[in-house]
Amino acid sequence: MDNGMFSGFIMIKNLLLFCISMNLSSHFGFSQMPTSSVKDETNDNITIFTRILDGLLDGYDNRLRPGLGERITQVRTDIYVTSFGPVSDTEMEYTIDVFFRQSWKDERLRFKGPMQRLPLNNLLASKIWTPDTFFHNGKKSIAHNMTTPNKLLRLEDDGTLLYTMRLTISAECPMQLEDFPMDAHACPLKFGSYAYPNSEVVYVWTNGSTKSVVVAEDGSRLNQYHLMGQTVGTENISTSTGEYTIMTAHFHLKRKIGYFVIQTYLPCIMTVILSQVSFWLNRESVPARTVFGVTTVLTMTTLSISARNSLPKVAYATAMDWFIAVCYAFVFSALIEFATVNYFTKRGWAWDGKKALEAAKIKKKREVILNKSTNAFTTGKMSHPPNIPKEQTPAGTSNTTSVSVKPSEEKTSESKKTYNSISKIDKMSRIVFPVLFGTFNLVYWATYLNREPVIKGAASPK
């Protein structure tokens, strides 16, 4: 009985162990099957896409554009600006860093597969047809290749391609500097097909005229300009090989005036004010007034030369040139004013000397007459007893002597008054020069600061 119970217990135990082992084996078998299936599925997808790409490129001729002989190839473009600047005034060019995107449709690259869009390696770009886009006003362009070529290529199942590359472009920026430094400019970026005319390839903006060119919020790298906005458009040119479409994007710039106020305008204004200080100096202070005049003229000459160093050698006068020229005229006029005052001062001294000489002659004549009358009076009185004290002087002698002294004192006082007097020209200059210079500044700044810049060939930014 005991043996039967023991054998039954062993059978139950073995049955339980068998069930547990079956469950464990089934569990591990269930968890391993999906992993194997995923790997197989992934390998299958890679194999499928490899076969698709090999099939697409089999017999593909990248020398021929899509739709050759059937339709015009349309290339849609847009630009994302990551960095704008710097701008060189002397070279009239600017530098821009962009993501340049192009999209077109190539029916030869249609495919059917588990994915609608294939992100491809940039190496495939050399095996398919791509637009021959070039920049008309570009002086130098760099395609970034670190750490790999900065290019992106995507293919959709209907044959639509998206081709993006990162470029740094140095382009021409024609500038009209008549209003410098209160000027504004529209720097263009022009691109299009090099070989295909409008009858074969046309360019259009992807997102219309408002969102096809976007500048990053922190993309401005400008020290002397404000980036006011950008506008896009198209141009058509006709050559001997056909008509071509040129895509244009204008970047609107407004110059910052602060640097030039500190470096040029304030020094010029202070130099003019310093030249007018000489009007308040004594007109006989020839060395001091000469130093004021010559120093201010030389200072204005130095300022005018240094102001031109930051500009290209244009053949017309800028707004700053006009301001410097007027300041130079005020400084030079102050020097001429001193020369005029000095001339009339010396002439006045000569006139005073002539008067003094005539007065001296009259004085000598009076002294001769006085001596004769004194001698006659002394001779006539010798018969009378000398009861008059030595200190007492005859009335006639006393009166004559007093008359002869007074003219000398008056001439001396007049001479001193002429020497220390203020010139009428200086009095007028103290009022006229500051008023005229203040009026000029008022008109100058009101005219240029309120002027709306007109840029030919570019619409104003919205």
Swiss-Prot record:
Transmembrane segments: 261-281, 287-308, 319-340, 428-448
Disulfides per UniProt: C173-C187
Protein's cellular compartments: Postsynaptic cell membrane; Cell membrane
Record topological domains on the Cytoplasmic side: 282-286, 341-427
Glycosylation sites: N45, N145, N207, N236
Topological domain spans for side Extracellular: 32-260, 309-318, 449-462
Catalytic activity field: chloride(in) = chloride(out)
Keyword Cell membrane appears in the UniProt entry: yes
PROSITE patterns recorded: NEUROTR_ION_CHANNEL
Main location: membrane
Topology relative to the membrane: Multi-pass membrane protein
Pfam families: Neur_chan_LBD, Neur_chan_memb
Cross-link Glycyl lysine isopeptide (Lys-Gly) (interchain with G-Cter in ubiquitin) residue location(s): K355
Region (Disordered): 377-412
InterPro entries named among the record's database cross-references: GABAA/Glycine_rcpt, GABAAa_rcpt, GABBAa5_rcpt, Gabra-1-6_TM, Neur_chan_lig-bd, Neur_chan_lig-bd_sf, Neur_channel, Neuro-gated_channel_TM_sf
GO cellular component terms, A-Z: chloride channel complex; cytosol; dendrite membrane; GABA-A receptor complex; GABA-ergic synapse; neuronal cell body membrane; nucleoplasm; plasma membrane
Keyword hit for Methyltransferase: no
GO molecular function, one term: signaling receptor activity
Keywords from the UniProt entry: Cell membrane, Chloride, Chloride channel, Disease variant, Disulfide bond, Epilepsy, Glycoprotein, Ion channel, Ion transport, Isopeptide bond, Ligand-gated ion channel, Membrane, Postsynaptic cell membrane, Receptor, Signal, Synapse, Transmembrane, Transmembrane helix, Transport, Ubl conjugation
Similarity remark: Belongs to the ligand-gated ion channel (TC 1.A.9) family. Gamma-aminobutyric acid receptor (TC 1.A.9.5) subfamily. GABRA5 sub-subfamily.
Function summary: Alpha subunit of the heteropentameric ligand-gated chloride channel gated by gamma-aminobutyric acid (GABA), a major inhibitory neurotransmitter in the brain. GABA-gated chloride channels, also named GABA(A) receptors (GABAAR), consist of five subunits arranged around a central pore and contain GABA active binding site(s) located at the alpha and beta subunit interface(s). When activated by GABA, GABAARs selectively allow the flow of chloride anions across the cell membrane down their electrochemical gradient.
Swiss-Prot/TrEMBL domain comment: GABAARs subunits share a common topological structure: a peptide sequence made up of a long extracellular N-terminal, four transmembrane domains, intracellular or cytoplasmic domain located between the third and the fourth transmembrane domains.
Noted disease: Developmental and epileptic encephalopathy 79: A form of epileptic encephalopathy, a heterogeneous group of severe early-onset epilepsies characterized by refractory seizures, neurodevelopmental impairment, and poor prognosis. Development is normal prior to seizure onset, after which cognitive and motor delays become apparent. DEE79 is an autosomal dominant form characterized by onset of refractory seizures in the first months of life. Brain imaging may show hypomyelination, cerebral atrophy and thinning of the corpus callosum.
Subunit structure: Heteropentamer, formed by a combination of alpha (GABRA1-6), beta (GABRB1-3), gamma (GABRG1-3), delta (GABRD), epsilon (GABRE), rho (GABRR1-3), pi (GABRP) and theta (GABRQ) chains, each subunit exhibiting distinct physiological and pharmacological properties.
Stated name of the protein: Gamma-aminobutyric acid receptor subunit alpha-5
Organism expressing this protein natively: Homo sapiens (Human)
